[in-house]
């Protein structure tokens, strides 16, 4: 079991501990539960889906990286496939506060970058901030997404974001988590190709500035993040954050990164290079390359 889970695991009910122990035994537990695993946990504990998600939130929150706030938020995004995806907030010392990742963004990106097609619900241990409510409104589930909070009845996103502004106001038809392929040729080594593939999946209807980041760890594992724009602009999630979300949730740490590649267009209206390289250097990665989409 990864050490970060030990305290939260010890506080779970005995029957949930017994059912989870073989799942968490792998140090690189992928911070997700398949539909089959969810069904098994429900049978072992007698909990329904909502109660089980609440019970698992401490494990999601244990994935948080909060050196500034020490305020750990966990989220679980429930995909239409039946898979549940953990998420947690992340803060980066030496970077800017604008690089911060919120738990809801983490769980949603985890699902999206894992190939999930849409979300049914998200469970969070604290009420979503306005930034996250706006981020969720970019999803193809839209205002129907169900939000579950401890001690409250579940409500749709529309109840938390009345009179919402979103992609439909800008006549955007392709939404976040819809399948997209921008068709750039995969060239270069494996890491460069991973970054280009991530750029091909970008959701960037507002700036038309595709980008993707791929991180290579010392053991050869590669984590890729795609750019995810938002109708309100500021809640946009950069591609580096997508890759860092996966790296963190899958049990790796920043010193494990040995090389990074950013893929973007040289003449794009928005350029990721400066922010990406500055944040990576703050995390200790200095081997950073850029490949141009063509």
UniProtKB/Swiss-Prot annotation:
The keyword Hydrolase applies. Zn(2+) binds at residues 102, 129, 132. Substrate binds at residues 89-91. CDD domains: cytidine_deaminase. Signal peptide: none annotated. GO terms for molecular function: cytidine deaminase activity; identical protein binding; zinc ion binding. Pfam families: dCMP_cyt_deam_1, dCMP_cyt_deam_2. This is Cytidine deaminase. The gene is cdd.
